[in-house]
């Protein structure tokens, strides 16, 4: 049985305060705290690239669990901001870390739904190829493509990375996953000519419309109710989006963690960062992991504790 054994993450030390940009964007303290829910964003160093963020997360993982580079059978990186257009970021990482040459590697081009998709892909690939240990990285440094004069993006997105160890000794396993795509709205979150554009209102409306019913359908087909879930790990798009989804689901606030005031929306890393913080909390038996955004795309997973 394959599943999540351990998670580690890295958030750069450098911060840019949103309070220092109130006058520039004509915003208030209340807007910062309650609407976007990001007081400062994390920004990578100028000499850090996507692979470097992955390496930092991997170093954190090795501090938590004994793992040999020879044990890694699969290396997958979820990113849409790679080091280069080609080769794949995972290959660069394999070379930098000196992992065995029999280690399979590939990238997944997905944004905020990427962690949930990645879990399914990695676990299925490993099972099909009789692999024992795999690493799922999420790293999407949006500071590479953000216009610092754009209110809709520069106040929200922060840099960060996470690595999830998938093995035959899991803490959480995937019970079921649902997926969705709304490609007709792709221009609501798009990078053109190297600059990110986001229709903030459009993305919020999309998430609030599509995510809650999809979660309810997922629960229903597994004979579960809202009350059977201990934590709802909702992609940390903004305070407004997370709160709105929780209200639509009629879930009490303590079941829906929100934790990006200090570093911002880390795209595909936001869910594993949340999950890492409850991984060893045995009172949490079953969680929903919900990712949504670029595509437009969404994916919801039921994760169940097995130890």
Name each model feature, range by range.
Residues 1-46, 148-205, 209, 213, ...:
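Condensing-enzyme catalytic core mediating Claisen C-C bond formation in acyl metabolism
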Residues 127-158:
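Flexible, glycine-rich active-site loops centered on histidine and acidic residues
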Residues 51, 55, 81-82, 100-102, ...:
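Claisen-condensing/thiolase-fold acyl-transfer catalytic domains that form or cleave C-C bonds
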């Amino acid at each position: 049985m394959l599943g999540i054994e351990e998670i580690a993450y890295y958030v750069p030390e450098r911060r840019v305060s949103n309070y220092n940009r109130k006058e520039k964007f004509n915003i208030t303290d209340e807007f910062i705290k309650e609407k976007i829910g990001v007081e400062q964003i994390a920004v990578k160093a100028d000499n850090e690239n996507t692979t470097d963020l992955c390496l930092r997360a991997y170093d954190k993982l090795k501090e938590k669990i004994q793992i040999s580079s020879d044990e890694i059978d699969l290396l997958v990186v979820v990113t849409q901001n790679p080091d280069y257009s080609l080769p794949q970021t995972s290959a660069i990482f394999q070379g930098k870390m000196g992992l065995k040459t029999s280690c399979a590697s590939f990238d997944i081009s997905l944004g905020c739904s990427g962690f949930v998709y990645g879990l399914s892909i990695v676990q299925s690939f490993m099972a099909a190829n009789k692999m024992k240990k795999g690493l799922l990285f999420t790293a999407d440094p949006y500071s590479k493509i953000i216009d610092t004069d754009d209110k809709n993006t520069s106040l929200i997105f922060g840099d960060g990375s996470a690595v999830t160890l998938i093995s035959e000794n899991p803490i959480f396993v995937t019970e079921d996953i649902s997926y969705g795509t709304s490609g007709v709205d792709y221009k609501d979150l798009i990078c053109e000519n190297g600059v990110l554009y986001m229709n903030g209102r459009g993305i919020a409306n999309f998430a609030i419309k599509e995510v809650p019913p999809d979660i309810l359908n997922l629960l229903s087909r597994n004979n579960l109710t809202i009350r059977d879930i201990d934590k709802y790990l909702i992609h940390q798009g903004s305070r407004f989006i997370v709160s709105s989804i929780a209200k639509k689901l009629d879930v009490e606030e303590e079941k829906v963690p929100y934790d990006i005031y200090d570093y911002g929306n880390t795209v595909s890393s936001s869910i594993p960062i949340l999950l890492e913080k409850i991984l060893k909390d045995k009172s949490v038996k079953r969680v929903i992991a919900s990712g949504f955004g670029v595509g437009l795309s969404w994916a919801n997973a039921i994760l169940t504790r097995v130890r």
